[in-house]
């Protein structure tokens, strides 16, 4: 989504490809100011962007409403990494964002509450203004500068 990528850029986040990382396929780090992935050809980047969306939209993956949706619709996940994706509401949101980007109509029809919630989070990010980005910079630049140095 263009608004998500714009926010990623405006906040100065970095995308890092590192085939030598171990222990994970991808990782979003708000404090580290980056997304790291092990395989460029993998759709993992969308999952990690999902963590970014949840964070920038106000940690929406920690809200009670989201946890209720997670409890209600996680059993409808049928793909190969179901165990990982459904282990907690945060991973479920990140993967739901991936599905929102790559398989929107399928997500909408099979997990409609999930779809609506992710869509609302994306809309929040899309509506962010320069003032919102400036506010986030004021809040986080000290942390980001520590990690970026």
Name these PLM-found stretches:
Residues 1-148:
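Active-site-flanking segments in enzyme catalytic domains
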